Amino acid sequence: MKLKYKRFLKIFAFGIGILAILSFAASYGFNYWLKNNLPEIIKKRSPYNITYQHLDVDIKTGNITAKKINISNKKPNDQNEIGLDGSIGELKISSLGIWDALYNKVINTDDVTFVHPKLRVVLAKPKDEKKGTNNKQPILFKNIHVQNGDIDILKFNKDSLITVKNLNLELTNFRMTEKEVKQKLPVVFDSYSISGENFIYRDENIYDYKAKRIATENGQMSIKGFEMKPLLSQQQFAQKYPNKTNLFAVTSREMTFKDVVFKDNKISLAEVKFDSPDVRIMSTNGKSPKSQKNFSYDIELDNISLKNGNILMLKPDGSQHFQLKRVSANMNKILMNEETSKGEIPFKYGAYSFETHDFNYNPGKYYKLSLSSLVLDNHKITVSDFSFLPTMNRTQFNKSIPVQEDLYTVKIPKIELVGYKVSNLNNHLQVEVNNLNVYQMYMNIFSSNLPPPDPTPRTFFSEKFRKIKFPLTIHHTKVINSLLEYEETDQGALAPGKLSFANLNVGIENINTAKLRGKNTMVTVNGKTSFFGTSPTTVLWTFDVANPQDAFNFKANIINLDASRINDFIRPYLHVSTSGMINSVNFDFKGNKYGIKGPFLMTNTNLKVELLDEKNQKKKKFLSFLTNWFIKNNTGNTPKQIDVDYTRAEKRSLFNLLWRGIETGLKGSLIGDTSKIEKTVDDIKEKKEKIKQKIDARKQNNQAKKGLFNGLIKKKETTD
């Protein structure tokens, strides 16, 4: 047995030795053969002209090392092959499928290392999937290493795609297919390390993405001197791409992020930071087709921060639309994909904070909106120094508007929204606010009848709320220590009639848009103010947003009003001046979009009225005497109630309708029943006319008698 076993071992060892010798000989022989025949094989089988000074091939492992390589295309204009032109200092390939490379034109390797490559790469033309063209990948690099390379990558039509200098790159599990290139996600990989300078990426000949330097350290990428530069002007972009709506220009001192993942048609980034970004948005009049796909892949961003940014948006004519300065923001868990793009908010998000200063917005040629700061997070929004101001004076405004329109002037030192929630339920926007606080607001509303009437009815607040397309609810609103002024003028007024409400404090409950079924749609407004700055006034105003007739109730009580204070209001229209004390004014109006009606009651002490001429300069003494004669002192007596009934024939605003109701009540209370005055005046005129007629008759009678007497004397003289 021992002899047989020893003999078997000798035979086995001898066989192994023979195989090793044969393997070595084959490897050496193949290596020798390949070195001598590879140029001829490349010439016959490869689409490239390749020269080298050193080549080492291991047939067993598929490892290849080549040095001082020069490469170029045999057919530079063939768009079906990847174009390669340039040199490589050293090339190291591990586990290459040699026969696939030589005979099937497919490069399949575990690892490839390029040392000092200076290459110009032209991508092959994407395959037409509809024609069933073979989409087999010509290059399969699992792991890629680049050391100190200068790379230019062009599209098949020679348009620039990527340029980078001094590139050092490490990619693991790298994949690239024609399909991904077509969908704008050209590569996917598991991990990376990169550094380079003067990076340029061109997107659809619309933008150049530039970076002075790119580097990674400990998994974090830093991009310095970033620029997203448009290749077209705003006008050229609008003409060439009529279905695109915005052109962007972006610069940033530095961008950093980590945990970049390109996988399964998804891009993921974390800890994204922008330092001093400057964003310019140039809008056009283009409209994107509804069927257009907005996202070819998913984007996930976690923990984004922006520091000291500026944002400017331009209108299609190049003028400023809005501007944000000194912007700082933080946001996490952002998701953008095809599904989210269908919603009113085109992305999902988690916690966020935002702060900006010197915000300016031009909503149109008549106004400019600005604020000194805006600070917000998931729970609270604070606005400082809000202003909404006209861009022209009242005369210019009246000349420029085609029809009658109110002119607003608004200044608010501080606005707070506390406990708000913005959701995107079923791709529909929904906003809910617990508390809205407005501090020390100044609002002036000026209305003029000088321009032609607007045939379009002015909408009340209930209709304005109904027209908001998404559910909006503000549970509690407070207007604190504010001033509201309403002025109106017409052709006959020498100065605008003016109402003012100082020390205005208002509580509003349940502002809503009547978009949530089963929810309360009644809005209640409770207010306290000083009418004309001196007279305590309370107001209760209610309306139902869901009421199609825009019905409302408006109840007010005014006390201790110096009658002279209302002259600014009544003199321009009624041509009346008052003095004395108005003890109280009470009215309870019910109205809708067709008119207003209700009781108006005023008590007074020593109230005197002066009727003026149309220029409000001369007193009509006699009519003033008669008017005051008919006005009774209501102290201690039951005052007379005026029943207001005013029709909204001109379809003016709610403020105008309230004005007309109050004006009607004041006119009835101050002047009284004008028919009595008119009757008295008519009676006096009639009596005066009768007296005059009697006097004239007597004069005529005396003249007749005198004429007869004179005739008799003349006749007597003739006889004599």
Model feature map: region roles:
Residues 16, 234, 393-395, 452-456:
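Acidic/polar low-complexity surface segments
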Residues 159-164, 319-324, 449, 454:
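Extended intrinsically disordered, low-complexity coil regions enriched in Ser, Thr, Gly, Ala
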